[in-house]
């Protein structure tokens, strides 16, 4: 199990510590791994790759405090969100309130130890939420950031990800002014609540938090890399459903077809996992032997 394995976390996030609320998902991880094995599937935590539609690997990660299951195939993981939205068989659960309460109760941060030096950095009307150093150069459009900065002047903050190098932070200050760059360790969700508009990427949980709280939310991604992120297939649909965000979230996330699991609201979460794996395996079966990536055995 990788989601809460100390050695694995040390490699991925270094000295940062995950929010303790995420440990509620540990039982889900164990159950998912067992069910994947029973169905002849490999499993992988927080990894993106492109396999055939008859995929080998069931991927999983955390998303806005939820457990998120998806196959390592773009076509199928995008279709599962569409199928979930069109599913009328699942009881509707109030996921929107769950997400809003996470912000209000200061539980939305993925990492612990977020600083609250808010008096030093008074809120502004617009907030740009950036990914970590390993993603910011390849996923974020600098031309878009310059355009946004020109539009809002000094009425905007750029929030570096907690995993951001001093070099990147220095470059941000050079580009957009030191007074417009928030500390990487400050509580971003305080500023998200105060802002009128949010700019973020398709690979960030801040997208759903901005949208569910009614903030006008827009992307800052480079188009050519946009579909590679593990949250793209959720955030892409969310960005086009801002007018009915709460009902979209509730209907989609409540469906087992979404791959979203949360034991705090999904009373029969094991059944939801079972139904999801059965559903995605049936979709997978359609493509058996359609595309062959290894030469046939003689």
Protein language model features and the residues they cover:
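A short, charged/proline- and glycine-enriched loop
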Residues: 1, 9-13, 120-133
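Secretory-pathway glycan-assembly enzymes, especially type II membrane glycosyltransferases
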Residues: 1-110, 293-296
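Catalytic donor nucleotide-activated moiety binding site of glycosyltransferases and closely related
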Residues: 6, 10, 14, 145-184
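Short, well-ordered alpha-helix to beta-strand connector turns
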Residues: 23, 38-41, 52-56, 124, ...
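Short loop/turn segments at strand-loop or loop-helix junctions that form parts
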Residues: 46-47, 59-63, 124-135, 160-162, ...
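A donor-sugar binding/catalytic signature common to diverse glycosyltransferases
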Residues: 47-53, 185-231
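Short acidic, S/G/P-rich loop/turn micro-motifs used as interaction or catalytic elements
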Residues: 50, 133-140, 163-165, 206
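Leloir-type glycosyltransferase catalytic cores
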Residues: 71-124, 227-298
